[in-house]
Curated annotation (Swiss-Prot):
This is Recombination protein RecR. Keywords: DNA damage, DNA recombination, DNA repair, Metal-binding, Zinc, Zinc-finger. Residues 81-176 form the Toprim domain. It comes from Escherichia coli (strain K12). Belongs to the RecR family. Gene3D superfamilies: 3.40.1360.10, 6.10.250.240, RecR Domain 1.
Amino acid sequence: MQTSPLLTQLMEALRCLPGVGPKSAQRMAFTLLQRDRSGGMRLAQALTRAMSEIGHCADCRTFTEQEVCNICSNPRRQENGQICVVESPADIYAIEQTGQFSGRYFVLMGHLSPLDGIGPDDIGLDRLEQRLAEEKITEVILATNPTVEGEATANYIAELCAQYDVEASRIAHGVPVGGELEMVDGTTLSHSLAGRHKIRF
């Protein structure tokens, strides 16, 4: 029997986070109440502000508290002419950490999934098509996940790009650095062989 309804409510709320079960939620709640109440207050304030103030960029659909995010409003990024299509805002963070891309993004917030009733307009492809028609885009880099749905989504967007004479490319999928071939699955190995490149001296 719980001694505090508020404690129960806190633990239930924490369980909305991915990977957090009853035990983890209980541990988090007790830690905040026993050892870090000031941290808990900062978390509550940050969460409240984020939930009320963060929306979507009008151009790329990533998370931002501005109408247009810092990446899309950057003149150098605009001049680049490249758009990288990703499935989620988290993918932008991953790509930005590499320091290898200097263009802009478009976030689908998912992928095509006819069985789940998710069509082109549900993932913003009408907005992407509008950008292809109106902006000077030289290349669309398709960085959707290497899943069946991700590949289908990439192929659909590639066909869309062809209608506007915009080059479409797919990010390479292959053997991870430090990996051993015998441990790599067949699909990944097939992509690696198909995407091989010449060694020049």
